[in-house]
């Protein structure tokens, strides 16, 4: 278990948490807890000297509440001299080999390599008496080499409600970066505030999106900005630009396509318009009587059965995919046949066929949306299959070479039995942190 306590030592907000980790060592034993303290070494501009006094004071404050750091990691923009490490070790009563320098890196993915070179991994395993083999960091080193190498840009528009604070979509933007590294390109994000598109004419929207190689609409809740997302999706569909929709992005894609297929602007979600004539997105009938808070929300890990020949089946390389969910409304099954006849392919559904999990457009080069949040499973050296293929399609649109797909072994049922795959509407049990993601 890793416990991270942020903030500054001495802040009143963090005192209960520091007391908790102090007691943790008493509860589980000295050799089962390791205190790692990360501090900043400020530099004096005139002399260029790195000052250790803030670190000394921080450790003094920790000692005052009963915590003696076992490891100190020193952050700095500049190289840290050996004499500075010795000084910190002397005045904090920490072994000099446990004072780890960590200079600011060009990429956060270089940090694990820096820490390994400094011996942090061996120190942790030795202090906690954990048997561990020498780590094979070949793949990670290759990843860092790709990051350092010059790469052509592929610009992706993220059309969202919360773009004023890009960290609101940090998992999405990082998943794009992971996929871009796989294809040896650089994902450049163009942040588009969906509300501003609602006030634009079609030609203005085209100008706002012109030049992007792909459009991504992430998740969200509430009506604000939804019509702007719908308009961006219409542009991607009509211009045949690669599109990826996540959670609300799928629902907006269904709304946009339904308006075209049904010949009406009144197709909508009952979340946004309870009086809509065509509620193509709606609560399932067995959800409408649930009144407990959160009771109608589908949370956690769910399986989906992927159709043969679909882009999602090709991406995952498996018949069953497991993804995490956090949503309340579903595609209204009443409209599935009519939308299917118009060209929408429900390419992934729950094992019992009741719930739509993935959609595609048959006549579009790459138009995929999922009701799930696949961005949460992407890793730097293992990009999520949907993001990988989305960025690949965007790069191909620019005439850039792309890397082949690398499929991992198909996901197994979290419950471990085929029966778990047949319960389309029942979630597999997931940790609380995943259920609330």
What are these regions (language model features)?
Residues 366-372:
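Short FAD-binding loop at a beta-strand-to-alpha-helix junction that anchors the flavin cofactor
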Residues 3-320, 325-363, 374-437:
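N-terminal beta1-alpha1 cap of cysteine-dependent amidohydrolase-like domains
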């Amino acid at each position: 278990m890793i416990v991270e306590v942020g903030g500054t030592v001495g802040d009143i907000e963090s005192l209960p948490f520091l007391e908790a980790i102090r007691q943790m060592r008493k509860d589980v034993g000295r050799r089962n807890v390791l205190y790692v303290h990360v501090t900043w070494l400020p530099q004096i501009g005139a002399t260029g000297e790195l000052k250790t006094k803030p670190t000394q004071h921080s450790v003094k404050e920790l000692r005052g509440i009963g915590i003696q750091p076992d490891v100190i990691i020193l952050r700095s923009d500049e190289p840290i001299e050996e004499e500075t490490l010795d000084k910190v070790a002397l005045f904090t009563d920490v072994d000099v080999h446990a004072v780890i320098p960590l200079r600011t890196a060009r990429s956060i993915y270089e940090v694990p390599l820096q820490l390994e070179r400094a011996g942090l991994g061996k120190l942790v395993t030795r202090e906690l008496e954990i048997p561990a083999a020498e780590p094979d960091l070949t793949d990670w080193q290759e990843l860092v080499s790709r990051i350092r190498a010059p790469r052509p840009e592929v610009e992706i528009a993220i059309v969202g409600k919360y773009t004023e604070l890009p960290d609101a979509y940090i998992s999405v933007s990082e998943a794009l970066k992971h996929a871009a590294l796989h294809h040896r390109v650089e994902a450049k994000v163009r942040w588009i505030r969906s509300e501003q598109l609602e006030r634009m004419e079609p030609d203005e929207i085209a100008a706002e999106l012109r030049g992007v190689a792909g459009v991504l609409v992430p998740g969200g809740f509430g009506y604000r900005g939804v019509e702007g997302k719908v308009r961006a999706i219409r542009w991607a569909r009509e211009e045949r630009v690669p599109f990826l929709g996540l959670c609300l992005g799928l629902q907006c894609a269904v709304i946009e396509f339904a308006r075209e297929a049904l010949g009406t602007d009144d197709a909508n979600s009952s979340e946004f318009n309870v009086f809509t004539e065509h509620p193509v997105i709606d609560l399932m009938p067995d959800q409408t009587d649930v009144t407990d808070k959160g009771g109608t929300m589908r949370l956690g890990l769910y399986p989906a059965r992927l159709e043969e020949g679909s882009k999602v089946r090709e991406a995952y390389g498996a018949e069953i995919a497991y993804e995490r969910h956090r949503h309340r409304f579903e595609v209204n099954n009443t409209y599935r046949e009519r939308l299917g006849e118009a060209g929408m392919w429900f390419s992934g559904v729950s094992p019992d066929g009741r719930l739509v999990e993935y959609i595609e457009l048959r006549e579009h080069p790459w138009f995929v949306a999922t009701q799930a949040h696949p961005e949460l499973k992407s890793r730097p050296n293992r990009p999520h299959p949907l993001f990988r293929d989305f960025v690949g399609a965007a790069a191909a649109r620019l005439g850039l070479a792309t890397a082949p797909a690398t499929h991992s072994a198909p996901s197994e049922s979290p419950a471990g039995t085929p029966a778990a795959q047949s319960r389309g509407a029942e979630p597999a049990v997931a940790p609380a942190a995943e259920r609330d993601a």
